[in-house]
């Protein structure tokens, strides 16, 4: 089963994502609360997929995306953004994100995106 890293500064959002993915059979998770933790944990744990929030303290999602892709150009990363962050989403795709999910999102959209990227 795939290892999924969930990166969001909001603990409730990490929990919600994890619970929705658990319901569909995913069980191996790594969590980070900011971009700096995400980069460090990515190098240590090499997850199959990273769900990465854009707006976070310490190190934002775009910077973390760049650093993760520098350490592993094949890293599979999906950005999570709030409404109104379209320019950041475009930049994230330019930097190598494979997809994005706009918050708030339906659980079905989350699961389908994760499955599509992992195929």
Task: Specify the residue positions occupied by each region the protein language model found.
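Short hydrophobic/Thr-rich beta-strand motif most characteristic of the beta2 strand and flanking loop
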Residues: 26-33, 41
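Receiver (REC) domain active-site loop signature in two-component systems and cognate sites
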Residues: 56
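Acidic catalytic/metal-coordinating carboxylates
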Residues: 34-37, 60-63
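Charged docking surfaces used in two-component/phosphorelay signaling
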Residues: 15-23, 90, 108
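Active-site beta3 strand of CheY-like receiver
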Residues: 45-51
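C-terminal output helix
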Residues: 87, 105-114
């Amino acid at each position: 089963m795939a290892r999924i890293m969930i990166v969001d500064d909001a603990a409730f959002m990490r929990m919600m994502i994890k619970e929705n993915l658990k319901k569909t059979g995913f069980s191996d998770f790594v969590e980070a609360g900011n971009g700096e933790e995400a980069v460090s944990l990515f190098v240590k744990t090499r997850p199959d997929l990273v769900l990465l929030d854009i707006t976070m303290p310490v190190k934002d999602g775009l910077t973390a995306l760049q650093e993760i892709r520098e350490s592993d150009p094949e890293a599979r990363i999906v950005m999570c953004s709030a409404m109104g962050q379209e320019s950041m989403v475009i930049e994230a795709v330019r930097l190598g994100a494979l997809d994005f999910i706009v918050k708030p999102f339906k659980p079905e959209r989350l699961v389908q995106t994760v499955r599509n990227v992992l195929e």
